[in-house]
Amino acid sequence: MMGKPEDLKLIDENGRRIDGRKKYELRPIKMEVGVLKNADGSAYVEWGKNKILAAVYGPREIHPKHLQRPDRAILRVRYNMAPFSVEERKKPGPDRRSVEISKVIRGALEPALILEMFPRTAIDIFIEVLQADAGTRVAGITAASLALADAGIPMRDLVAACAAGKIEGEIVLDLNKEEDNYGEADVPVAIMPLKNDITLLQMDGYLTRDEFIEAVRLAIKGAKAVYQKQREALKEKYLKIAEEVGGGE
């Protein structure tokens, strides 16, 4: 959160935001499953101006062997921002923020996976941010969850994520870049909707207790809308496969 220029209005007198959205409106979201031929599972998500690719490999044998768990698979997540993903070119390779977000995403996804079915193996998730525009962690979780489902990894539920935040004293859904830079708070949330479980809850900034509750409720509502889009994307992929199989008869 940065100091806002005096002439920048994030929300107008009609409740419209800088990009024309209403307070409780998501940015446009597009999802596609099975986009990489050489991965066990993959997904591509465009969320506002974010462009994110997720690939899953595994379950596969772990090297070195001392990392193996005798009772379950281990989940490894690598979140990376491409050098060209932001306006000021980023140094290649993982930085402290990428390492931290990798851990956050792993923690959000792990409760959904039935890892005990694959002892002594690893499931690797690679999340590549091709273009960044605020909310990359929730978009990354959403893409990774789709890629896991595409890989056929047994899951208790999909994990869907969304953030709410505070701009100019108002609680709003799904912050864009300007709102994230100059707003007062950001609350990313990830859920397993069928189980009604929260797998990620963070806050950056300052909110009153009532504002925090409102932001969490709004983020959950947004995540449920994202979940429906995930289901549609998976359905679309398998309808395509069915058509291809049917067409080959």
From Swiss-Prot:
Sorted UniProt keywords: Cytoplasm, Exonuclease, Exosome, Hydrolase, Nuclease
Gene Ontology MF terms: 3'-5'-RNA exonuclease activity; RNA binding
Cellular component terms (Gene Ontology): cytoplasmic exosome (RNase complex)
Enzyme class (EC, first level): hydrolase
Key word Protease present: no
Task performed by this protein: Catalytic component of the exosome, which is a complex involved in RNA degradation. Has 3'->5' exoribonuclease activity. Can also synthesize heteromeric RNA-tails.
Quaternary context: Component of the archaeal exosome complex. Forms a hexameric ring-like arrangement composed of 3 Rrp41-Rrp42 heterodimers. The hexameric ring associates with a trimer of Rrp4 and/or Csl4 subunits.
Protein's recorded name: Exosome complex component Rrp41
Native source organism of the sequence: Thermococcus onnurineus (strain NA1)
Source species taxonomy: Archaea, Methanobacteriati, Methanobacteriota, Thermococci, Thermococcales
